[in-house]
Every structure is written in structure tokens, then in C-alpha cells.
Amino acid sequence: MQDEPTPTELIKAVADFLRNEVTPVIKGHNAFKLRVGINALDLVARQLALEPDNDAAEAARLSGLLGMQGSLGELNRALADRIAKGEVDLRTPGLADHLWQTTMDKLAVDQPNYASYKRELEGKGRA
């Protein structure tokens, strides 16, 4: 098995090549489509880099909140069921913090340049 380069490094290298070498010579609608493709590669690179740790942390928080073990999908379904039944709400200790952290982790992958996300990282967001 080949260890280097990692899938993340390969994706970043392709995205950088497209961004730096190909984008300057492409015009019009094809340039737009190229930027969409580069953005998709950047998103996949962030998913590979961040999601395993984010998912593990989310599952650990949910296990603590719900007092049960399971896959991330199972735990999220259990949380949704308990919310729907009125057993859990924003007054439940730890739930608001869990939801906030989960949102921040997802933004780090999906929209790291989102202005509100950046403000929160700088400590100027949520009071």
C-alpha cells in the first residue's frame, strides 16, 4: 500500500494545478464550470481532512447526551425522536452546545469562508 501522497494531498495538488495553471487560460462559461469543479475538489479535501474527527466528536457528544451508544446516524435519529417526543429540548443540559459545535464543524467543511463562521472563530459571534 502506498502511503504518500495521501488522497487529500492528491486532491489539493489537482485543485491547485487547475486553479493556478488552467484557470488563467480558460474564459467565459467554461471558467465558471472550472471554478465549480475546483470548489468541489476543495470541499472533498476538507471532508477527508476534517470529517473523521468531527464525526467522532459528534458521536461522543451524542452518546453523552443520550446515554446510549450507536453509529452517528443512529444517535442522530435517536436525538430527533426524543426532540419530536418532547423528551429533549434546548433546556436539556449540553444540547445547545452540542448543536452549536456540530454546526461549526459542518461549516468548517462546507463553508469555511462564511462570514458568520469566521466571526465566530474570531470570538465576535455568539454571546
Model-assigned labels for residue ranges:
Residues 39-49, 70, 103-107:
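Short alpha-helix boundary/capping elements
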